[in-house]
Amino acid sequence: MAAGSITTLPALSGDGGGGGAFPPGHFKDPKRLYCKNGGFFLRIHPDGRVDGIREKSDPNIKLQLQAEERGVVSIKGVCANRYLAMKEDGRLLALKYVTEECFFFERLESNNYNTYRSRKYSNWYVALKRTGQYKLGSKTGPGQKAILFLPMSAKS
């Protein structure tokens, strides 16, 4: 190489020119989603119920976040083998199969917590009350502690 010359590296194939964005697919390691409101981990039960628990050894808090497209994820309970969904009445539950109600816009907020806003019901967020129960989507909004989640490693 001559002095002052510039070398360019080839772009990664299949990145769609996304400027460093992850291609669609799962994030390698399972996560636990820690809610700022009450210190609960989001839990998906095998029977489809959704709530929060403080016990970090509960196997039902291990979640797989799947990138569906840029900024959109689905959230699957690893042990429950079910997908988090928000219904038209704002309830959270877990389904055996992915539907349009299972896609959430994931956003990193300025306080370094993530929010998960329903793609289908666009003003509603995944949220946990201080009691550990889920909060109806229709009762959620920006600025609430209940919608703030910190993704943490769930490696055993």
UniProtKB/Swiss-Prot annotation:
Signal peptide: none annotated. Pfam families: FGF. Heparin binds at N37. One of its GO terms (biological process) is mammary gland epithelial cell differentiation. One of its GO terms (molecular function) is identical protein binding. It comes from the Eukaryota. The modification Phosphotyrosine is found at Y83. Phosphorylation at Tyr-83 regulates FGF2 unconventional secretion. InterPro entries: Fibroblast_GF_fam, IL1/FGF. There is a cross-link at K96 (Glycyl lysine isopeptide (Lys-Gly) (interchain with G-Cter in SUMO1)). Keywords: Angiogenesis, Developmental protein, Differentiation, Growth factor, Heparin-binding, Isopeptide bond, Mitogen, Nucleus, Phosphoprotein, Secreted, Ubl conjugation. It is found in: Secreted; Nucleus. Belongs to the heparin-binding growth factors family. Monomer. Homodimer. Interacts with FGFR1, FGFR2, FGFR3 and FGFR4. Affinity between fibroblast growth factors (FGFs) and their receptors is increased by heparan sulfate glycosaminoglycans that function as coreceptors. Interacts with CSPG4, FGFBP1 and TEC. Found in a complex with FGFBP1, FGF1 and FGF2. Interacts with FGFBP3. Interacts with integrin ITGAV:ITGB3; the interaction is required for FGF2 signaling. Interacts with SNORC (via the extracellular domain). Interacts with glypican GPC3. Acts as a ligand for FGFR1, FGFR2, FGFR3 and FGFR4. Also acts as an integrin ligand which is required for FGF2 signaling. Binds to integrin ITGAV:ITGB3. Plays an important role in the regulation of cell survival, cell division, cell differentiation and cell migration. Functions as a potent mitogen in vitro. Can induce angiogenesis. Mediates phosphorylation of ERK1/2 and thereby promotes retinal lens fiber differentiation. This is Fibroblast growth factor 2.
